[in-house]
Structures are given as structure tokens and as C-alpha cells.
Regions:
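Generic preference for well-ordered secondary structure
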Residues: 1, 24, 94, 98, ...
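Amphipathic/hydrophobic helical signal segments and adjacent flexible N-terminal regions
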Residues: 1-65, 131-147
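Alpha-helical interaction segments
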Residues: 6-8, 68, 79, 117-119
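Surface-exposed coil/turn segments at beta-strand junctions on protein surfaces, enriched
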Residues: 10-12, 91, 118
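General beta-strand recognition
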Residues: 18, 49, 97, 122-124
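Central antiparallel beta-sheet cores of small beta-barrel/beta-sandwich binding domains
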Residues: 31-111
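Glycine-rich, aromatic-bearing surface loops/beta-hairpins
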Residues: 100-101, 106-147
Length: 147
């Protein structure tokens, strides 16, 4: 199985992405904003053919880095690690959809849409955060491919 062939849109996301994450509360007020640098890569590892590293940088000097290896089955990539559990799949030729839970937030569900530009150099992402089935915040992400 060649993941790039099975999920051609996901393959177009391979590379380095820089951007800004803006999180708003349920009423639309900005509650967080930070820069990001994501690495999306494919490998010959049969257990985890997709790997993603997210690096976050805040203006006050804080940083975070998270590694997300993903398995593949049934036309979806599956994340299962200490931080998240969930899956991503292609909806059409330019939209990827994800649902997952944050393992450190009880009764959480996140729903994400990733929209890739036709030239493959920009993407817009939105996360809807639910806790106990109630919307608690949204994260809006704008990114540019740099490599």
C-alpha cells in the first residue's frame, strides 16, 4: 500500500508549513494566538506511514512541540497517542476532515476542516472544540507552505 496514492490530497500537504493559530471563545473573543511551524511527512514505516510534527511559538517566549505518528486503514489516517485519538480522511479534491479527542480533556471532541489552495501553497484550517457536546471555542489557522 502506498499512502500517497491512496490519499492523494493528503500527499499534497507533505512539507513544511508556517502560520498563525488564533483561538476564539464560543462568543468569538480572541483567547489565544501563536505562530506555528508544522512538518508533514510520509515514510516507508508500515506501522506509521504518516508523521506530523507541530511546533508552536508564543510572543511571550513559550514553545511547544508535539509529534503525531499516524497509521493507515480504510482510506483514513489514524492518530492514537498520549495527546490525541482520532482520524483524518479526504472529503473531496481539496478538503481534509478530521475528528479527534484530546486525551487530556474529559468528554472532548474536536472537528477540523483543512482547505488546501489549488496551487498547494496555502491552507486554511478550522477546529471546533466541543466539551460535553457544547461548543467551547474555535481555532482558526492560516498557513503557507515553505518547503
Amino acid at each position: 500500500m502506498e499512502l500517497r496514492k491512496e490519499m492523494p490530497l493528503l500527499a499534497r500537504h507533505e512539507g513544511q508549513w508556517v502560520g498563525v493559530y488564533t483561538t476564539v471563545d464560543a462568543e468569538g473573543r480572541i483567547i489565544d494566538q501563536h505562530k506555528s511551524h508544522l512538518t508533514c511527512e510520509f515514510s516507508n514505516d508500515s506501522k506509521f506511514p504518516y508523521k506530523q510534527t507541530n511546533r508552536y511559538m508564543w510572543s511571550d517566549g513559550r514553545t511547544e512541540e508535539h509529534f503525531f505518528p499516524a497509521s493507515y486503514a480504510n482510506k483514513k489516517i489514524w492518530f492514537e497517542n498520549e495527546r490525541i485519538s482520532g482520524a483524518a480522511w479526504e472529503v473531496d479534491s481539496d478538503t481534509v476532515f478530521l475528528t479527534w479527542k484530546r486525551n487530556d480533556i474529559a468528554n472532548s471532541k474536536l472537528v477540523e476542516m483543512i482547505q488546501l489552495s489549488s496551487d498547494g501553497l496555502r491552507r486554511s484550517r478550522t477546529w471546533h472544540w466541543f466539551v460535553n457536546d457544547a461548543l467551547v471555542k474555535r481555532t482558526l489557522i492560516e498557513e503557507t507552505k515553505v518547503v
